[in-house]
From Swiss-Prot:
Pfam family, any one: UPF0102
CDD domains recorded: PoNe_Nuclease (cd20736)
Organism: Bifidobacterium longum subsp. infantis (strain ATCC 15697 / DSM 20088 / JCM 1222 / NCTC 11817 / S12)
PANTHER family linked to this entry: UPF0102 PROTEIN YRAN
Family: Belongs to the UPF0102 family.
Protein name according to UniProt: UPF0102 protein Blon_1698/BLIJ_1758
Length: 124
């Protein structure tokens, strides 16, 4: 955990694995992972116990030295995530009964021992 030998891509994938597992432990169901559109990638799409489709952006860091991980989600990134989410919702393969849609952020600080997980609901 927090292994300095991981590439940035591997490190991000590890953070996404922790985030998905953490949410699944809280009763959520994974619908998609790393879903690509022309607007970018949706890290994780999940269905929570209240039947809300939640688009989860995951930000992983080794420390808080450069600020909070969620600060990396700029207004432009949020705009592209919204467009990507629309594409996901319009894709017939992703039809799932749901009552609402929202965007959450999960930050993971991978440190020695246990990862520090912070879940921000309705982040934007």
């Amino acid at each position: 955990m927090g292994d300095r030998n991981l590439t940035p891509k591997q490190f991000g994938a590890l953070g996404e694995q922790y985030a998905a597992a953490w949410l699944e432990e809280h009763g959520w169901t994974t619908l998609s992972r790393n879903w690509h559109t022309r607007y970018g990638e949706l890290d994780i799409v999940m269905l929570n116990p209240e039947y809300t489709v939640v688009f989860v952006e995951v930000k992983s860091r080794r420390s808080m030295h450069y600020g909070y991980p969620q600060e990396a989600i700029t207004p432009a990134k949020q705009h592209n995530l919204r467009k990507a989410a629309c594409d996901w919702l319009l894709d017939r393969r992703n039809r799932v009964p749901h009552t609402a849609v929202r965007f959450d952020v999960v930050t993971i600080v991978l440190r020695v021992g246990r990862p520090l997980v912070h879940h921000i609901e309705n982040a934007f």
